């Protein structure tokens, strides 16, 4: 997170609150030197006095098993430590008996990483050396990421705190889904996303490769799929193999998704004979649910799918394959005489039963290919075998229902990033809350969860700021114990991890400034940056209603520049909550908040001046008009509260009306501090 012109004063005040003794209630420290910035938090952590000082003589060695995958992981971790410290640490192993870091691994792990891979590790750091132990190479990878995060400055040195960590994930399936069907994402985006995933211990890259808007994977068996269904934007088989290898080198599985029988316009443009009735003439540019679908009644459909999936399993070795299965709406399934006759002959009472029949047929193909089926929660049907995995996107109820029926499940409801919700809200969604009324055996069926980044309103320029750093907070929910729920401390650590992710090459912090410069055509964006820091995109649905986005919409507006859940949201909320605990005594927080509100008011004239020469920036002119009044309201509220005086009659009503106006649609962006400001107003007496 950058401070600088936005408000170093505010940032310092907020951090002073966060770095307090109460901030570490979950992970008490025995050594004042140690600041627990780990994300995700480990299962067990103990701290002892002391530290291991890092010097250019720092070296590493291995004992037990080693291979090229492990060596590469260690060298990558050491390279990151070099960048973090500026120390000239040699990138080669020494004798384990004389090195500061010893990595001891029991074995390679599985030839094809699976959901059952042992990811546990232990890390012991003394003032003399650090020892990382793991049963598998993947476990060592997880421990190395913890080691990187433990490095911290101490005076004019960099040190590792003396800690003992025993760690393993709460859930075995911790994924991130990237939709490359609606908007294609270049290989570079995919690779840096995988780098970010590894840093926060995610282990499944769910690659959404087909959609109504595009077929993104090369098929040599059916070349028209990309020739007619991709606009030339697709991954060659060699590129896909490269991504699989890149992910494996970081302990991440790649699970491909091929949408069927719905969301299949791109299939049917190329092979119209597979359609249930009408066939599309071009890939779909609009978003939403299409009424085209593969025909479940034709044997030709299954022969096609068999040949296609056989080809794809030669590229994607993971034992799980996602068939989509959601939002299948085909009028022909209710009206076509031929399809209705088929349903009658097979005793299929409705379209849901017909789709279950389709899923069963596809499942037989996958079984022959030694693959497990995954699908969105619409596939849940008693006719399916129990080894099918149900991914819940419409709510946690379907996840629980599936477990009650004996199905393994993944939760994505609550982790949809296109809703532009704050990290803190995602963070408190639990795939398996203690309140879930499941038996111990049923609870084991909940494999974990996946973050979902749908691509209707993102492209290669904006994806990083939509995925990161919020995904890091969700990654902690998947890895750490259920008891780790301190939202304030999560945000404190998220700030540190966000900077670490930027160091890996992610653009989530730099993209905003670059976009603001492009909007205005100038490098003079100090005041615009400050103005932008309190605005964020509205949700996917709100934006669609206001802008009617399609695949052809150019994503270069102010809404595309600003980040969801920018740091100011939590910083201001934290300061206001603290101030409201003792408004008559807490002069320090009042001073910090007054300074911040004044900065917001002062930023507006320069921004309005820039709007005169930037039509795209002028789209948020109403927000520029509203900000000074909102900031003034905050100052007034604190003045009444700190003095212990009442506001004039009607003051609260007029200010709440101002809030209501500021919450109405304008410029496809919303203010980040409205809820916190409302709490200030509510505390004032009249």
Where are these regions (language model features)?
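Bacterial N-terminal signal peptides that target proteins for export
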Residues: 1-12
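Bacterial N-terminal signal peptides
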Residues: 11-21
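Contiguous, structured surface segment used for ligand recognition
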Residues: 26-171, 478-481, 485-487, 492-504
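Substrate-binding groove of N-acetylhexosamine-processing glycoside hydrolases
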Residues: 31-32, 38-41, 46-47, 54-56, ...
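Feature activates predominantly on carbohydrate-active enzymes
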Residues: 80, 110-320, 336, 361, ...
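Residue-level detector of anion-binding/catalytic polar loops
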Residues: 88, 203, 253, 372, ...
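Short, internal active-site loops enriched in acidic
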Residues: 107-109, 260-262, 326-330, 379-381
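N-terminal leader/propeptide and maturation segments of large enzyme subunits in energy/redox metabolism
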Residues: 324-341, 346-348
């Amino acid at each position: 997170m950058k401070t600088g012109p936005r408000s170093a004063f505010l940032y310092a005040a907020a951090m002073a609150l966060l770095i307090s003794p109460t901030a570490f209630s979950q992970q008490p420290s025995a050594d004042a030197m140690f600041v627990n910035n780990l994300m995700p938090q480990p299962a067990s952590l103990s701290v002892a006095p002391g530290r291991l000082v890092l010097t250019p003589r720092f070296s590493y060695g291995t004992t037990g098993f080693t291979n090229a995958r492990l060596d590469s992981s260690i060298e990558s971790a050491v390279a990151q430590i070099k960048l973090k410290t500026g120390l000239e640490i040699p990138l080669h192993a020494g004798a384990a008996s004389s090195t500061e870091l010893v990595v001891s691994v029991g074995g390679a792990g599985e030839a094809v990483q699976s959901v059952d891979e042992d990811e546990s590790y232990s890390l012991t750091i003394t003032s003399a050396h650090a020892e990382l132990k793991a049963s598998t190479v993947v476990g060592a990878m997880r421990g190395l990421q913890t080691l990187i995060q433990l490095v911290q400055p101490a005076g004019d040195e960099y040190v590792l705190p003396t800690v003992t960590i025993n760690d393993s994930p709460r859930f075995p399936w911790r994924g991130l889904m990237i939709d490359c069907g609606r908007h294609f994402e270049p290989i570079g985006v995919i690779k840096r996303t995988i780098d970010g995933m590894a840093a926060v211990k995610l282990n499944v890259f769910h690659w959404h490769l087909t959609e109504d808007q595009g077929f993104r994977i090369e098929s040599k068996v059916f070349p028209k799929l990309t020739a007619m269904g991709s606009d030339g934007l697709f991954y060659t088989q060699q590129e896909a193999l490269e991504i699989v290898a890149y992910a494996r080198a970081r302990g991440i599985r790649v699970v491909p998704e091929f949408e069927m029988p719905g969301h299949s316009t791109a299939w049917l443009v190329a092979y119209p004979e597979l359609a249930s009735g009408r066939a599309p003439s071009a890939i779909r540019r609009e978003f939403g649910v299409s009424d085209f679908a593969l025909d479940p009644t034709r044997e030709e459909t299954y022969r096609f799918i068999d040949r296609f999936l056989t080809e794809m399993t030669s590229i994607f070795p993971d034992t799980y394959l996602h068939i989509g299965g959601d939002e299948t709406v085909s009028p022909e399934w209710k009206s076509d005489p031929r399809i209705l006759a088929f349903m009658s002959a097979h005793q299929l009472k409705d379209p849901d039963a017909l789709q279950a029949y389709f899923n069963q047929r596809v499942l037989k193909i996958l079984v022959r290919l030694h693959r497990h089926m995954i699908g969105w929660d619409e596939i849940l049907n008693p006719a399916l075998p129990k080894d099918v995995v149900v991914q819940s996107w419409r709510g946690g109820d379907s996840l629980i229902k599936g477990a009650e029926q004996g199905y393994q499940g993944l939760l994505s409801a609550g982790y949809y990033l296109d809703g532009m919700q704050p990290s803190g809200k995602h963070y408190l969604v639990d795939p398996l809350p203690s309140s879930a009324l499941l038996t111990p055996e049923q609870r084991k069926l909940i494999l974990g969860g996946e973050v979902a980044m749908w691509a209707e309103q993102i492209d290669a320029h904006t994806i990083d700021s939509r995925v990161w750093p919020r995904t890091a907070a969700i990654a902690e929910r998947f890895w750490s114990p259920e008891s780790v729920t301190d939202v304030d401390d999560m945000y404190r650590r998220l700030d540190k991890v966000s900077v670490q992710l930027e160091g890996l090459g992610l653009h989530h912090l730099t993209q905003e400034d670059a976009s603001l410069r492009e909007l205005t055509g100038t490098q003079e964006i100090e005041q615009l940056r400050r103005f932008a820091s309190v605005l964020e995109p509205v949700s996917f649905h709100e934006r669609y209603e206001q802008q009617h986005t399609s695949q052809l919409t150019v994503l270069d507006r102010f809404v595309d520049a600003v980040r969801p859940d920018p740091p100011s949201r939590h910083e201001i909320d934290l300061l206001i909550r603290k101030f409201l605990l003792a408004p008559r005594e807490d002069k320090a927080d009042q001073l910090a908040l007054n300074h911040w509100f004044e900065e917001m008011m002062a930023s507006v004239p320069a921004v309005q001046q820039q709007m005169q020469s930037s039509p795209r920036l002028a789209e948020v002119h109403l927000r520029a008009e509203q900000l000074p009044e909102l900031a003034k309201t905050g100052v007034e509220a604190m003045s009444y509260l700190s003095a212990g005086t009442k506001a004039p009659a009607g003051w609260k009503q007029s200010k709440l009306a101002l809030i209501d106006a500021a919450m109405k649609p304008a410029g496809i962006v919303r203010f980040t501090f409205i809820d916190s400001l409302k709490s200030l107003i509510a505390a004032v007496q009249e």
